[in-house]
Amino acid sequence: MKKQLVLFCDFDGTITENDNIIAIMKQFAPPEWEALKDDILAERLSVQEGVGKMFSLLPSALKDEIVDFLLSTARLREGFREFVAFTKEKGIPLYIVSGGIDFFVYPMLDGLIDKERIFCNGSDFSSEMIRITWPHACDGKCQNGCGCCKPSLLRKLARPDGYHVVIGDSITDLAVAKQADYVLARDFLLKKCQELDLPHAPFTTFFDVVDHLQRLEVIA
């Protein structure tokens, strides 16, 4: 009996061509954000702590301006719309698992992905500065302070009959890639999959992703 494909797809740098949090910080944040970014990359700060501190540098009044900026500048990776159509046609569950924030992830995926299939961090604009909330924080098996914990989400959403495929690009996708049955990877994640000998294939566009999925024998 063939297994059911279940897809877990990253957002920043995977669905979009660039990292949207970095784009926001470069455009709107004071210089202090750079040190926070470096501390995250050096693992001196958890992603949850670092991203929370970065957004706390931004006034809540900037919300609409930030969304307008991203909607006018961010680009979806080539073939993404066709990829979404392919998953719907084949009845393949597709979950977006993102370290991004709801106030920009939802508008950018509006009309493509239902909100209940998007798992990302939340936001609170009721105070002077933006506050990030963490509805998908680490479960009892993860202590990494992920923010939006992708390994926890895979454990929660996995199916007994599932063949779980992770699609991603960066360090924040590595832990969940290690749990997956198969990985479609680019950039940093591709190098790590090669180093760790994880079952994987490279992709550049989402047309490549569809080609790889069609070749996987688990497709009914």
From Swiss-Prot:
- The main enzyme category here is hydrolase
GO MF term list? 2-hydroxy-3-keto-5-methylthiopentenyl-1-phosphate phosphatase activity
**Protein's UniProt name:** 2-hydroxy-3-keto-5-methylthiopentenyl-1-phosphate phosphatase
Its recorded reaction(s) are: 2-hydroxy-5-methylsulfanyl-3-oxopent-1-enyl phosphate + H2O = 1,2-dihydroxy-5-(methylsulfanyl)pent-1-en-3-one + phosphate
Asked whether the keyword Amino-acid biosynthesis is assigned, the reply is yes
Ordered alphabetically, the record's keywords are:
Amino-acid biosynthesis, Hydrolase, Methionine biosynthesis
Q: In which pathway does it act?
A: Amino-acid biosynthesis; L-methionine biosynthesis via salvage pathway; L-methionine from S-methyl-5-thio-alpha-D-ribose 1-phosphate: step 4/6
Residue stretches spanning the membrane = none
Its GO biological process annotations read:
L-methionine salvage from methylthioadenosine
Q: What role does this protein play?
A: Dephosphorylates 2-hydroxy-3-keto-5-methylthiopentenyl-1-phosphate (HK-MTPenyl-1-P) yielding 1,2-dihydroxy-3-keto-5-methylthiopentene (DHK-MTPene).
Which family does the record claim for this protein? Belongs to the HAD-like hydrolase superfamily. MtnX family.
EC code: 3.1.3.87
Keyword Amino-acid biosynthesis annotated: yes
